[in-house]
Swiss-Prot record:
Protein name: Ras-related protein Rab-11B
First-tier enzyme category under EC: hydrolase
Keyword terms, alphabetized: Acetylation, Citrullination, Cytoplasmic vesicle, Endosome, GTP-binding, Hydrolase, Lipoprotein, Magnesium, Membrane, Metal-binding, Methylation, Nucleotide-binding, Prenylation, Protein transport, Synapse, Transport
Catalytic activity, reaction form: GTP + H2O = GDP + phosphate + H(+)
Subunit organization: Interacts with KCNMA1. Interacts with RAB11FIP1, RAB11FIP2, RAB11FIP3 and RAB11FIP4. May interact with TBC1D14. Interacts with ATP6V1E1. Interacts with PI4KB. Interacts (GDP-bound form) with ZFYVE27. Interacts (GDP-bound form) with KIF5A in a ZFYVE27-dependent manner. Interacts with RELCH. Interacts (in GTP-bound form) with TBC1D8B (via domain Rab-GAP TBC). Forms a complex containing RAB11B, ASAP1, Rabin8/RAB3IP, RAP11FIP3 and ARF4. Interacts with WDR44.
Written domain comment of the UniProt record: Switch 1, switch 2 and the interswitch regions are characteristic of Rab GTPases and mediate the interactions with Rab downstream effectors. The switch regions undergo conformational changes upon nucleotide binding which drives interaction with specific sets of effector proteins, with most effectors only binding to GTP-bound Rab.
Length: 218
């Protein structure tokens, strides 16, 4: 029998990218398990966790993938990005080099991910305000220039972690919903599973959303 965690209307794959040590793993654990590990070690390979939220009465299940930031693990790039509909591009507000590398990560994302992927720039470790090396206005301007949403977070004290994930998931949901509406208006309704992809309008049956709607293929 299925568990309550199996009951969802949409499944969205969201990836965490950015330099090693910026706090990607702790953002993941804070959002999915409300945990923070001061002694967390660098991720080796790939891991993911899930959490469901409600948006407009729909259950959105987020499958959030975390990967190592080190170059020696970048061979997994293609599989990591496959099917992702959202990305959190994370830097450390107290380490300017991690912000400088955002441009390289953004290029990698553009090269390997779907062209319609929703991207949020995340300045993590906002609790280290006394060590700030990246001005908020500078990062916000970069995000606007590159059509990214922007937020500063602290996985340590939980500041804006919920908001970051919920905002990007809601934005993805809005895009998917608009595509469903447009597709419904443009095509005759036909039976079949609803497989949602933000780059390809889904087929809908006009009935109750299929439990296994999803936005990613593993």
């Amino acid at each position: 029998m299925g568990t309550r965690d199996d009951e969802y209307d949409y499944l969205f794959k969201v990836v965490l990218i950015g330099d090693s040590g910026v706090g990607k793993s702790n953002l993941l654990s804070r959002f999915t398990r409300n945990e923070f590990n001061l002694e967390s070690k660098s991720t080796i390979g790939v891991e993911f966790a899930t959490r469901s939220i409600q948006v407009d009465g729909k259950t959105i299940k987020a499958q959030i993938w975390d990967t190592a930031g080190q170059e020696r693990y970048r061979a997994i790039t293609s599989a990591y990005y496959r099917g992702a509909v959202g990305a959190l591009l994370v830097y450390d507000i107290a380490k300017h080099l991690t912000y400088e590398n955002v441009e390289r990560w953004l290029k990698e994302l553009r090269d390997h991910a779907d062209s319609n992927i929703v991207i949020m720039l995340v300045g993590n470790k906002s609790d280290l305000r006394h060590l700030r090396a990246v001005p908020t206005d500078e990062a916000r301007a970069f995000a606007e220039k590159n059509n990214l949403s922007f937020i500063e977070t602290s996985a340590l004290d939980s500041t804006n972690v919920e908001e970051a994930f919920k905002n990007i998931l809601t934005e993805i949901y809005r895009i998917v919903s608009q595509k469903q509406i447009a597709d419904r208006a443009a095509h005759d309704e036909s039976p079949g599973n609803n497989v949602v992809d933000i780059s390809v309008p889904p087929t809908t049956d006009g009935q109750r959303p299929n439990k296994l709607q999803c936005c990613q293929s593993l």
